[in-house]
Curated annotation (Swiss-Prot):
It comes from Elizabethkingia meningoseptica. This is Flavastacin. GO terms for biological process: proteolysis. Residues 1-15 form the signal peptide. It is an enzyme of class 3 (hydrolase). InterPro entries: Astacin-like_dom, MetalloPept_cat_dom_sf, Peptidase_M12A, Peptidase_Metallo, Ricin_B-like_lectins, Ricin_B_lectin. O-linked glycan consists of the Man, GlcNAc, GlcU, Glc, GlcU, Rha, Man heptasaccharide. Zn(2+) binds at residues 189, 193, 199. Binds 1 zinc ion per subunit. The keyword Transmembrane does not apply. Residues 92-289 form the Peptidase M12A domain.
Amino acid sequence: MTRKLLILSGCLILALNSCKSDMETTPASSVDHTTTQLNGTTIHKLLINGAYTYVNEVNGEYFYADDITITAEQFNQLKRMANPDISTVERSTIVSSFIKTWPNATVYYTLPSQGSLSTQAYNTFLTNINKAFDMISSKTSVKFVQRTNQTEYITFTYSTGNSSPLGWVKNRVNGIKIYNTTYPAIIAHEIMHSMGIMHEQCRPDRDQYIIVDTNRAQDGTRHNFNLYNDYAGHGEFDFGSVMMYKSTDFAIDPNLPVMTKLDGSTFGKQRDGLSAGDYAGINHLYGPVNSTSATNGTYTLTTSLAGDKNIDITGSSTADGTDVILYSATTGNNQKFIFRKSEHGYFTIKSILDSTKVLTVRNNGTANGTAVELRTNADTDAQKWLLFNLGNEGFGFAPKNAPSLRLEVKDGLTTNLTPIVIGSTDQTLQPYTKQRFTLTKVN
């Protein structure tokens, strides 16, 4: 992170604090991706889905926000998203791979070395890292386990600022930098970025709750107000979230705040602990999607089209090839399913009628409108489903054999016996209502 949070003095120090006259415009590669220079920082401005996303590049490191770093691969994915000519298939693939959560809701870690810290300061740092772990895990399913030989894990370093990589990436070590070693909640804030959690003010529905005027933000800080359309906010907008910034953060003039409530009033921030909304969001993100097989439980899948219609196995039959349909909600086992992890991100969806039978794309089809059926589990790609956490909108499902398609209610109908199929989408970031489902745990 390029800033220090000095809680006691209330002072916000920015490394990027020069005036506009220091900016030098460089040739743009396209209207969808322009770059400017600011004191050794390359500011990338990307037009994605009609909104601008900013990424700051400093010495080959990419900052998605002041305290969020992304890999070169993730940055290149954003650049591809800024290309209006990419196919729906590629766009869908990018969305599904940009941010990943930790497998089995388990975050492996190593503790920092003492470095330049005094013995007392070092012991305080270690104590507060463990307090941050406890703060997160006390009311969630997430576990923090000290690393033995795992390839992916988080590390901590005392630094001049706070920052963390974004989410889990295969074969990557997430190096978390901490300046505020005496504040467990700030350490938790950065750990949550490594868990794949964004800032509250950047959720896609923020305009329903706050006004953001980035013209009031200091040069080089607009990336802190990116709208994360691929990030799903859960619950009501949470002004008390540990992931929320205050009105005047990054403001040129504190009397002209970057953010206000809709009525024009300002708000502060807290770094004392996680809010109830933070815990609810983590539990949704790391709920059935990332739980271990022992704790997945049994769920119903309700369409977002109608709260009283569930995915159903026709006639409660367990014969191979049985149609999967929409039907009025009941308490029958024909509407209950068990999620079992197949590989990271992918799950099989088993019928409680017969746990050897799973939801399957018929004949391994990849065409729009291909039916979904019940069939004996053969561990094929047509039986593995990538789950998209859509926050308040529930979940979306993409079959591994056809990753650009989504599980959907055919034609968006809500009549009984409507087939469940896989269908194309032009709205990979905001899926059609017919492609959204709520998972409700029934035991």
